[in-house]
Amino acid sequence: MLPNIILILLIRYCSCGAGSRVYEKYGKQVQLSPATTSSYREWYDSNREHSTRNNTNVDDFQTQLKKSLENTTAAYNATFMQELIEERQRYLEKLNEGQFINDQRRLVEELLDPNYYEKTVHPKRDYTRPTRVNLSMSLYQILDVDEHMQSIEVNVWMVQHWYDEFLDWNPVDYGMINRTIVPYHQIWIPDTYLYNSEELEQKKTESLMNAQLETGHWNQKKDGAKVQLMFPAIYKLSCRMDVRWFPYDRQNCTFIISSWTHDKQTIDYWPLSSTVNLGNMARNDEWEVISFEFVRVEETFKCCTAPWVMLYAHLVIRRKPLYYMINLVVPTSIITIVAVTGFFTPTSSSSERDEKLYLGINTLLTMSVMMLMVCNQMPSTSTYVPLMSWYYIGIIMVIVVGTFLATGVLAIHGQKHYNKPISDRIRKLIYNPVVEFFILSPPTSLIDLWTEFGVISEQRHSTHLDPLLLQHMDPISHTTRADPQHFFGSISSQMCDLQSTYSYTARLATITRQYTQHAKMKALRKNQYRMSMDTSQARGVKKQKMQRRCSLEWEFLANVLDRILLTIFCGFTFAVFIILIGFDSFFTFHTDSPPKTM
């Protein structure tokens, strides 16, 4: 046997290459011959490779080792075999007691040994050097956006990684293990906190699990092991809602992420990427994500001299307006148009016009209920009025003004009972070709009355001549017809002569009849009395026609006003509806965000 030849006992071989610390902890020095050492090493290496390929467990390997030792006992001298058997018995006892485990468990136990590692200590051997924490985030789902409470709730996946110089190891000493998993509460982790979270207890929002360690032995920088902490979180954070353009609003909800106790001299936060991962996000039917970007800002507070590194994650979302268009805007516009049409539909009776007032009151009640539904979703702020509220205010004003104007038209319609004709100016306004073509034509009965009473201009009358005058008129020559001046002059002169002759003949005949019919004076008086009776009947008929004319004039004026107001209000309502439907296409606006500094 050669001196100073040290062989790690069977425990080192069974642990598959443990480091010096394990040897110091469990090992023992023995002196073996070169032949013995070489033979046992060859046997161990061959059986170790065989057991590794065949995934042999510890019990099978123990049985093989026991059988091999029994077979080789006779080949060695009694002294060495006695020592080997004793060492084998001690190994079997410790193996049965569970003191020898696989490489991964041994690695974890040694890394987290309280005598070697302290989780409250900064993970840098030089404490003056800050620990760089790289942070990334993936948005999984937008759970809720509460405009009234001005908060948003999201489901995100957080990833933080940094380097810990006290957790590094050599993979050669641990079966080439480059990565392992350890409980998060047994290592140092940064106190990353969401500043604007509505939940103060972090355990209720973050589900921390295990941390992943990756050796830094192969890294040339020698920064230590890479620690990666991945966990899901449900954050409910306060978000100032800007709903002035509701339902076309865009919201910018900012995540303020930083350490609560460490400034830049201890922890330096950096975003792993400038944008948040949206690849795994579940679709939201109400909101559309426009952007989700990280911004790194160094801020100085009054409490501390050193700056604090803050990570701002700006989540910009846009509301999908289809739901509100279908359930609020379209029904409101239809109700308004129906109400306006009912207000200003021409009617002839007063009872029908009275129903318009009840229609206006019912429509106002409907608008108030629908506006209340919108107000329940809006934040209680006096800074601005949402676009949807302006829409309902405008619609309510249309209904109110329409109701008042319908009352005015009703009052105009009631003037027909006073038998007072309308003024000539108003008559000229409502009876002209423009109004007749674009708005409303007067009824035929009213035109006949206007013609009978001479209201319509003389150009609309036909000139009728007495047949006796036409019989005594001389024919007009073709030469006179060719010259318009002589034509009208000839007619005028003949008319004057004939009228003079006709008047003289008529007066002479009247005097002759008076003298010749003196005997019939009594009958004549009877005839005069009968004619006076006919005249009073004619006056009554004329009065009735005058009343009819006044009634038709006021009704026609009310109908013209109804038609004009109907066109104006329907056009206004339709224009507001089109503007609101296409508001997002007609107008563009931007959501404010803090300055981007890195």
UniProtKB/Swiss-Prot annotation:
**What range does the record give for the signal peptide?**
1-16
Q: Which PROSITE patterns match?
A: NEUROTR_ION_CHANNEL (PS00236)
Cross-referenced CDD domains, in alphabetical order? LGIC_ECD_nAChR (cd18997), LGIC_TM_cation (cd19051)
Among SUPFAM superfamilies, the record links this protein to: Neurotransmitter-gated ion-channel transmembrane pore (SSF90112), Nicotinic receptor ligand binding domain-like (SSF63712)
Q: Name one GO molecular function term.
A: transmembrane signaling receptor activity
What topology does it adopt in the membrane? Answer: Multi-pass membrane protein
List where the protein spans the membrane. Answer: 324-344, 357-377, 392-412, 564-584
List of glycosylated residues: 54, 71, 77, 134, 178, 252
Query: Which residue intervals are topologically Cytoplasmic?
Result: 345-356, 413-563
Q: Does the keyword Secreted apply?
A: no
Taxonomy, superkingdom: Eukaryota
Q: Which residues lie on this side of the membrane: Extracellular?
A: 17-323, 378-391, 585-598
Q: Does the keyword Transmembrane apply?
A: yes
Where does the protein end up? Postsynaptic cell membrane; Cell membrane
Give the UniProt record's GO annotations in the biological process aspect.
cellular response to nicotine; chemical synaptic transmission; monoatomic ion transmembrane transport; regulation of membrane potential
Entries under InterPro entries matching the protein:
Neur_chan_lig-bd, Neur_chan_lig-bd_sf, Neur_channel, Neuro-gated_channel_TM_sf, Neuro_actylchol_rec, Neurotrans-gated_channel_TM, Neurotransmitter_ion_chnl_CS
Q: Which family does the entry's similarity section mention?
A: Belongs to the ligand-gated ion channel (TC 1.A.9) family. Acetylcholine receptor (TC 1.A.9.1) subfamily.
**Name the UniProt record assigns to this protein:** Acetylcholine receptor subunit alpha-type acr-5
Organism, per UniProt? Caenorhabditis elegans
Q: Taxonomic lineage per UniProt?
A: Eukaryota, Metazoa, Ecdysozoa, Nematoda, Chromadorea
GN (gene name) = acr-5
